[in-house]
Amino acid sequence: KDYETQKKAGKNPVFKAEDIMLPPGKQAFVMSQDDVCYYEYMDGDGFASRIVVGEDGKPVCEMKMDDGSISVGAYDLVPLLDEFIEEHPDFSYRGAKAVLAFTGYNGILGYRTAASYGTAEYQAGHPDFNYEEEKAQAAKVAQALKDDGYELASHSWGHRDMGAISMEDFVTDTNKWDTEVAPLIGGTDIILFPFGSDISDWRPYKDDNERFQYLKSKGFRYFCNVDSSQYYVQIGTDHMRQ
């Protein structure tokens, strides 16, 4: 985060490795959850239906029960992790929690925010659906998550194989995410590649990597694989890859 702040201030910041100072007996690690969207296909299969802001201002999950009622509780990672940290506050370093990554094709956080839900055709078939309210509620929850210590990230718009699709599809997907999702979460500089499909091989990114440069142009600085290990970290002058 300091990178962009210093850059806007006219400085010339660079990424560099530093020692991680932790209390004795503690281990640094990155926790992430991708696809925090509660897709339509998950309805009725025992998953939470969406994340809402609870009465205490903290994010919590809703779940549709078999009888049609709505139950509010710890039905997914976010509220479960929050409860654990309340009992074990030393688990979290300076309030840091998990990285949550979103696609966009079905919306985010259980809210139907994709552009397709705002079309006249969809509205005609769902007259009680309020597209603008869905987006407003998603943005409210996203802010609550950030206030609660979570980092928000991209998981591509269409859950695409970002290392294999054509450059044309790559640009289209990235632009859709930038248009439909980024404004709801306040932007991000983190991307978690779907399927662990990176945009290069194991060697460091090169300046002539067209996909790398395009993602950087959209503000991304942290490039992560969902199946990475703690030993795989590459730090460039203006980005980190893990």
Give residue spans per PLM region.
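C-terminal active-site subregion of NodB/CE4 polysaccharide deacetylases
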Residues: 1, 6, 11-32, 38-43, ...
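Active-site beta->alpha N-cap acidic-glycine motif
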Residues: 1-144, 148, 199
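Structural detector of well-ordered beta-strand residues that form the stable sheet scaffold
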Residues: 99-101, 153, 224
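Residue-level signal for short, function-critical loop segments
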Residues: 104, 158, 194-197
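Aromatic- and acid-rich polysaccharide-binding/catalytic face
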Residues: 142, 146-160
